[in-house]
């Protein structure tokens, strides 16, 4: 089983990214579970979505703290609150304009800086696509399932008028993740 965690603040689309990933895994014949945690604030409150993906049945619907393989963070307060769930040596991708890991964190985890929000805003031209940029990043780092099936599930989840922008966002997420890994 692969355990992923996306964290940010309300309004950044982290829950949507989790829904797309878990739905894509189910459509692919596997098991996908999404468990979200967020405050009552509509925008701005800490948000977390844990995604469990497996080819075998998942018997417990929550991520195991300290065993998460991959985390993506777009807000400092959420990063600080939820980072300890990532296993030693696990991968954490941060939005460097908003999240600043301390030196100790860089020793515990493999941390990559990818400007997800800037990519969505400046290269896609629509900041709302940041969750899809994040989706592409997560897929490139984890390879948890067929990337084309995730792309298709994502395109099925967005309105027609924004399909092209979201497809570009997904591709840019993959591209930047490849570059970050070297």
Whereabouts are the PLM-identified features?
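Active-site cofactor/cluster-binding pocket
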Residues: 1-182
């Amino acid at each position: 089983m692969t355990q992923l965690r996306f964290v940010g603040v309300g309004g950044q689309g982290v829950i949507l990214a989790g829904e797309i990933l878990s739905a894509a895994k189910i459509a692919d014949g596997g098991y996908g579970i999404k468990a979200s945690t967020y405050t009552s604030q509509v925008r701005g409150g800490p948000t977390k979505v844990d995604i469990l993906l497996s080819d075998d049945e998942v018997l417990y619907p929550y991520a195991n703290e300290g065993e998460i393989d991959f985390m993506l963070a777009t807000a400092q307060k959420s990063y600080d609150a939820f980072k300890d769930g990532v296993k030693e040596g696990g991968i954490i991708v941060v939005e460097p304009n908003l999240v600043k890991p301390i030196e100790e964190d860089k020793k515990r985890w493999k941390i990559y800086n990818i400007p997800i929000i800037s990519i969505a805003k400046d290269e896609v031209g629509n900041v709302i696509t940041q969750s899809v940029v994040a989706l592409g990043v997560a897929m490139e780092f984890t390879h948890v399932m067929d990337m084309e099936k995730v792309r298709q599930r994502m395109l099925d989840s967005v309105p027609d008028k924004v399909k092209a922008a979201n497809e570009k966002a997904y591709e840019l997420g993959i591209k930047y993740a490849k570059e970050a890994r070297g």
